[in-house]
Every structure is written in C-alpha cells, then in structure tokens.
Amino acid sequence: MSSQNLNDNPKNTSSAAEDKKKQTSSLKLAPIPTTSPWKSSSPDSNTVIPVEELRDISKTAKPSKNGSGSIKLTSNTKWTPITPSVIISGSKDTNSKSGKNSKNSKTNKKMKKRGKYNNDINKKDFNGQTNSTSEISNVSNLESKPLDANAKVNIHSSSGATANGNIKRITNNNNSTNGRQSRNYQNRNGKTRYNNNSRHSQAANNAISFPNNYQARPEYIPNASHWLNNNSRNSYKQLSYFRQQQYYNNINYQQQLQTPYYYSMEPIFKSIESIKNQIEFYFSEENLKTDEFLRSKFKKANDGFIPMSLIGKFYRMVNLSLGGDPNLILASMREVLQHKETNHLEIALGSIEGAQKNMADDFNPLENYFIRRENWAEYAMESNFDENDDETEKYNIEKLLGPNDLDNYSYMGYPNFFPSNENGKKSQSYDQGEISRQFEQNLQIND
C-alpha cells in the first residue's frame, strides 16, 4: 500500500499545476464602467448629452457680476423695478428749511434797517453841530455855577427840561453809533472840554492821602470822555482802578528795594553754613576713625596742622563754595571759630616753607591758613611722629586765631570792624558806601 501511494503522488501534483494554468488563462480585464458608482442609478443618468448643449449650460451657469448672491427663479414671470418713496414718521414740518431761510432773511432786513437808521442819525447830528455845542455849553454853565436855595426852583422849572432832553439825546446818539464814530464826533463837537473839566474837578476834590503825608497827583486817563459820556459807572471804576494801582505801587516801593538784597544773600548764607558743617564733619571723631588720608596729614613736625588750601580742593568743598570761592570758605572758617568750644578745631595763621610767591591773579588766600583738631595726636599714625622726615612739607605757624580775627570775612559785611575813636567807642559817622564796597570785595560770588 505504501508503494502505491508513492506512485500516485507525482500524478496528483501535475494535475494541480494544470488546473492553475487554466484558471489564470480564463481571467480577463473588466470593461470600463459607463456610469459613475457615486451617482444615482436613475434611468436618466444613462442619457448622453451632446457637447453643444454642455457649452450652452456652462455659459448660463456663470454667475452675473451684479447679482452674484441673488435668488434665481425658474418661472416665466417678469419682474419690474420699483421706485421706493421714503416716509419718515414725526411731527416735523416739511417746510422747516424754508422757515429757517425766512428767519435769516428777516434778521438781514432788520440789520439793514438799523444801518439806515444810524446813517440818518449821523447826518442829522452833523447838520446840527452848532445847536448841540450851544446846548452842551449851557448845561456846563448850569452845573459849574453854585446853586442857591431860590435858584434851584427856577432852574428845574425853566431849563431843567431842556437840559435833560439834550443829555438824553447825546447818550442815545452815542449808543447808536460805533466806537470810532462816537470818538470823532465828540472831538468835533467839543464834548471833550466839558468832560475833561468835570473829570479834573472830581479828581481834585477826591485827592487820595497816602502814608508819610504824601498826596498822589490825579492821573491823566486818555479817552476818558468816551467813558464818561457812555456810562458814568464805568468811568468811576476806571478812575478808581488807576488810583488803587498807584497806591499799591507807592507802598511797596521800599519793599522792592529790600527784597533783592534778601534773596541775593540767601544762597550765600546756605553756602557758608554748609561749608562750616562739612569742615566740622571732616575733623569729627566719626570720620577720622575711617579717613586714613586726613590721619596721614597729622605730622608731628607741623604740630598736626593741615593747610586749608588742601581742604578747599576737596570735591564737596568746591561744590559747596560755588566753584571754589575762597571768600566763602574764609567766611565759613570764621563760623568754625565762633563754635570752637563744640567742634574742638583750631585755625592758625602761617606760611609754607619754600613756597614760591605767586602772582596776584594766582594768589590763594587759603595758603596762609592751617587747621587741626585739638586732640590730633590720638588719630595720627605711627609714621607721622618722625621729625626727621625730609619728604614732608614744613609750615611756619605764626599764631592761633581767635573768634574775632576773621571778622573781615564775615558774610554780614561789617559786624566788628568799624573804625573806633580814641575812647574805644565805635564811630557813628562811618561811610555806608565804604561798607558796601568792602562787602562786595569780601564776597565775590561766581555768577
């Protein structure tokens, strides 16, 4: 049985290969589909549309430029355009514009009438110049004469009505005309004489008394007649304004002379006070504990004195002294000596050995002054006690200065250096101009 199965196996394999060949030869390509599988399977889809109709459809399918978003209608009805009429609800009249125009025309007519009326009045006024001048002169004579008790009745009865009528006429004419016309008209008719006389009489009667038995002269106000004719109240206010202004200026005249002196001295006071405080700070215990530079300058050969010319070159001293003005530093040194008991500082007068004498322009007055602290030895370094040190500069100290030795540099100018008599009393006849000149020499401020 086993041998038969072995013989049958090759036959079976050959038959299977033949069947596969037959299957492969029977397969063919499918035909091209005539209809799209994604479209509906309606009988109309199989109809063929000619090319000419497709071209017509593409032309009609293009949207129009004007009506791209409009709705297309398939019916055969025709539509005609409509012209809409806008209707606004409200109570406004349709003839509002015409009403405004009519109002404007009315105002224009009124302005023309006023202009004609003013021109007529001006013509009448210029024609009747002689009458107006005579009437005004009568009124001025009536007011200038003193009125008795019996004469008052006659004036009011006979000429009062005419005078009042003339004054009313004048005021009405002035109010109707322009400012320039009224001024010219007043000058031609001689009204300025009447108004100036009344104004001078009022100013003379109303003279203002000032302090120190001074009376102000009445001021002249140009074109005052225009104000007096138009409105008496305005003229009174104008006169009072000028009088008050003169009174104000006369009282404050002395104060204006004093205030510049006060304000010009204020920065000097602040500068001197700040320099004094800065010098006291340099030689204070708090600063000397940390300031090794100043401690190195306390030499035993110079008895601990430091030249003020060196202190004046410090950055803060230059700024506080308004650019390094030595006069301000000398004035602050005087203040330091005035507070000697509290700051424990000493200032001496002397010179530097071997120093060249500078020209007058280059001379620094601080080179002749030296400063130290009373207990300077406590803060001096060990190397400063060598007296044979040739590198250190040596100072020739002449004397220690007292609180009154620097009075010539006082910021007040003349506190304690008045010239005295033989009895030691201060002279009362000291020239104030000399004092001011000395003060300007001592305090030359850098502008």
UniProtKB/Swiss-Prot annotation:
Per UniProt, the keywords (alphabetical) are: Copper, RNA-binding
Q: SMART domains, alphabetically?
A: LA
Basic residues compositional bias: what residue ranges? Answer: 106-116
Record-linked PROSITE patterns: HTH_LA
GO CC list = cytoplasm; cytoplasmic stress granule; cytosol
Q: Does the keyword Chaperone apply?
A: no
Q: In which residue ranges is the amino acid composition biased (Low complexity)?
A: 89-105, 164-184
List every stretch annotated Disordered: 1-143, 157-198
Q: Which residues form the HTH La-type RNA-binding domain?
A: 265-368
Compositional bias segments (type: Polar residues): 1-16, 33-48, 61-88, 127-143, 185-198
The cross-references to InterPro entries, in alphabetical order and at most eight, read: La_dom_prot, La_HTH, WH-like_DNA-bd_sf, WH_DNA-bd_sf
Q: Which GO terms describe its molecular function?
A: mRNA binding; RNA binding
SUPFAM superfamilies the record matches? Winged helix' DNA-binding domain
Domain of life of the organism in this record? Eukaryota
What are the BP-aspect GO terms?
intracellular copper ion homeostasis; positive regulation of translation; regulation of translation
Task: Print the miscellaneous field.
Answer: Present with 861 molecules/cell in log phase SD medium.
Q: What name appears for this protein in its UniProt entry?
A: Protein SLF1
Q: Which organism is it from?
A: Saccharomyces cerevisiae (strain ATCC 204508 / S288c) (Baker's yeast)
